[in-house]
């Protein structure tokens, strides 16, 4: 279920809190979902008149592992809302690293999943629209340039123009 496009209607109906549903959700899932809904709520709060869900919010919610989204019974009786053909999860993105800090012009991070240098990564920073990070230059913790980050919990460095929180 995804009600983000209908936040304005939910607030008009008196909803005052939102809960992330599901069992065993990862820190990545919770971080993306919380950041996306925070962005949607802030956008709604700042809107003057007709509100439309920001495109980046929809894109982020489609990056996390999910089944086909629906609105359940919130907008009336659903027609053909139960999906049998595509009942599996959609998993097109993966968490590859968690940022630990920033030193000497580089993001320092702990690897979660492997990737090759040159792969553009999406960076999720609390309270911000996600942005791309170029990994053309990729270093191990000793500062040696590497072609791939491959070992779980490996410490890596990626040159970047600013600190990421």
Task: List where the protein language model places each region.
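Surface-exposed amphipathic alpha-helical tracts and adjacent flexible/coil segments at the periphery
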Residues: 1-165
């Amino acid at each position: 279920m995804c009600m983000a496009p209908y936040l304005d209607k939910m607030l008009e109906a008196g909803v005052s809190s939102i809960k992330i549903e599901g069992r065993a959700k990862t820190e990545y899932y919770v971080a993306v979902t919380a950041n996306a809904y925070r962005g949607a709520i802030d956008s709604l709060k700042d809107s003057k008149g007709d509100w439309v869900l920001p495109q980046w919010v929809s894109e982020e919610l489609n990056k996390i592992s999910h089944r086909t989204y629906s609105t359940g019974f919130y907008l009336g009786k659903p027609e053909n809302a139960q999906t049998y053909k595509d009942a599996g999860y959609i998993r097109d993105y993966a968490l590859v690293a968690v940022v630990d800090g920033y030193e000497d012009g580089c993001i320092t991070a702990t690897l979660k999943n492997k990737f090759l240098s040159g792969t553009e990564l999406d960076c999720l920073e609390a309270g911000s629209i996600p942005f791309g990070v170029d990994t053309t230059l990729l270093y191990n913790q000793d500062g040696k340039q590497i072609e791939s980050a491959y070992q779980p919990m490996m410490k890596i460095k990626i040159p970047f123009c600013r600190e990421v929180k």
